[in-house]
Amino acid sequence: MNKLALYCRSGFEKELAAEITEKATALGVFGFARVVENSGYVIFECYQIGEADLLARKITFSQLIFARQLIVVSDLISNLSVQDRISPIIEYYRQQEKILNLKQSSDIWVETADTNEAKTRAAFCRKFTVPLRQAFRKQGWLQAKNKKSGITLHIFFTQSNSCYIGYSYNNNHAEHIMGIPRLKFPAEAPSRSTLKLEEAILYFIPPNQEATRFNENKYAVDLGACPGGWTYQLVRRGVFVYAVDHGKMATSLHETGRIEHCAEDGFKFRPPKHCKIDWLVCDMVEQPRRIADLISQWLVKGWCKETIFNLKLPMKKRYFEVKRCLQQIKERLNEQHISFQIQAKHLYHDREEITVYIRLM
């Protein structure tokens, strides 16, 4: 196994290929990315044996922007028999036992790409998981007592009779099958954009810290808030929100008594002087560098402590633009000797955008 399989949103394969190549090179690992446009994944092939495993351990998954999952995989296994796909899969894993401790495996995920073409395979993957898991347990696999330090086995079907076989490290991978969190749209939310902020909070904020970072003692500003999809996520967590937008906010949010609607331009709005703002959130449709400059201003001036915002990406040179915007923010903060934590992710509910989280330390 000397390849990495990385999942992504369909159409972002080139960005992911550029990112993984850059990360690998920084670690002294060289290889090449196999990219099929709109396939929903990238295969990165290393030149030296053992280097794919090295990357899976050394690249911090949470620092990858466009990857939904990070898996060490085999060569593509083709022409699997419809009558028996399980036996050759088990045999391949057996051949890896000298270098891979399968008794440290905790689960098996059968996956496919997140594309319209692959949707027909998704149902098969779910059904195939049950007998495959049973067969693996008979081998003495999937028995890891400490899941956090174990591995997850992956079968990634590119066709119904072709798959990559591999594994990921539980302490350095996405926690969801296919890297996709399953969130339910709340009926009372004003817009579907609410799922973007919900996913961002679940991704960036540790579960055991959420109640202390979002509660009735916290204040937030939502720039470009109308009709209130992002404001809703803050209000339901108890936060008081200054909702900034010339448009109307949902009546249901006004009825909570936890918002103040400020009919102003998000770029000109200034925080109220009578309270300290804990959170700034922003999902305005604007040039990414303009948003990066706006967020930098809020952070440098100390107008907020934490922020979650989206950068809308151009049609071309998207990875280049992301890097430039993030570097722009980092340079502004470093110039002022401000300590900070920053993460960026192309979340499942994002489309032509990425979500960025910054916390002042």
Swiss-Prot record:
<dbReference type="Pfam" id="PF21239">
    <property type="entry name" value="RLMM_N"/>
</dbReference>
<dbReference type="InterPro" id="IPR002877">
    <property type="entry name" value="RNA_MeTrfase_FtsJ_dom"/>
</dbReference>
<dbReference type="InterPro" id="IPR040739">
    <property type="entry name" value="RlmM_FDX"/>
</dbReference>
<feature type="binding site">
    <location>
        <position position="193"/>
    </location>
    <ligand>
        <name>S-adenosyl-L-methionine</name>
    </ligand>
</feature>
<comment type="function">
    <text>Catalyzes the 2'-O-methylation at nucleotide C2498 in 23S rRNA.</text>
</comment>
<feature type="binding site">
    <location>
        <position position="265"/>
    </location>
    <ligand>
        <name>S-adenosyl-L-methionine</name>
    </ligand>
</feature>
<protein>
    <recommendedName>
        <fullName>Ribosomal RNA large subunit methyltransferase M</fullName>
        <ecNumber>2.1.1.186</ecNumber>
    </recommendedName>
</protein>
<keyword id="KW-0949">S-adenosyl-L-methionine</keyword>
<dbReference type="GO" id="GO:0005737">
    <property type="term" value="C:cytoplasm"/>
</dbReference>
<feature type="binding site">
    <location>
        <begin position="226"/>
        <end position="229"/>
    </location>
    <ligand>
        <name>S-adenosyl-L-methionine</name>
    </ligand>
</feature>
<dbReference type="InterPro" id="IPR048646">
    <property type="entry name" value="RlmM_THUMP-like"/>
</dbReference>
<feature type="active site" description="Proton acceptor">
    <location>
        <position position="312"/>
    </location>
</feature>
<comment type="similarity">
    <text>Belongs to the class I-like SAM-binding methyltransferase superfamily. RNA methyltransferase RlmE family. RlmM subfamily.</text>
</comment>
<keyword id="KW-0698">rRNA processing</keyword>
<keyword id="KW-0963">Cytoplasm</keyword>
<feature type="binding site">
    <location>
        <position position="245"/>
    </location>
    <ligand>
        <name>S-adenosyl-L-methionine</name>
    </ligand>
</feature>
<dbReference type="InterPro" id="IPR029063">
    <property type="entry name" value="SAM-dependent_MTases_sf"/>
</dbReference>
<comment type="subunit">
    <text>Monomer.</text>
</comment>
<keyword id="KW-0808">Transferase</keyword>
<dbReference type="InterPro" id="IPR011224">
    <property type="entry name" value="rRNA_MeTrfase_M"/>
</dbReference>
<dbReference type="Pfam" id="PF18125">
    <property type="entry name" value="RlmM_FDX"/>
</dbReference>
<feature type="binding site">
    <location>
        <position position="283"/>
    </location>
    <ligand>
        <name>S-adenosyl-L-methionine</name>
    </ligand>
</feature>
<dbReference type="Pfam" id="PF01728">
    <property type="entry name" value="FtsJ"/>
</dbReference>
<dbReference type="GO" id="GO:0006364">
    <property type="term" value="P:rRNA processing"/>
</dbReference>
<dbReference type="GO" id="GO:0008757">
    <property type="term" value="F:S-adenosylmethionine-dependent methyltransferase activity"/>
</dbReference>
<keyword id="KW-0489">Methyltransferase</keyword>
<dbReference type="GO" id="GO:0032259">
    <property type="term" value="P:methylation"/>
</dbReference>
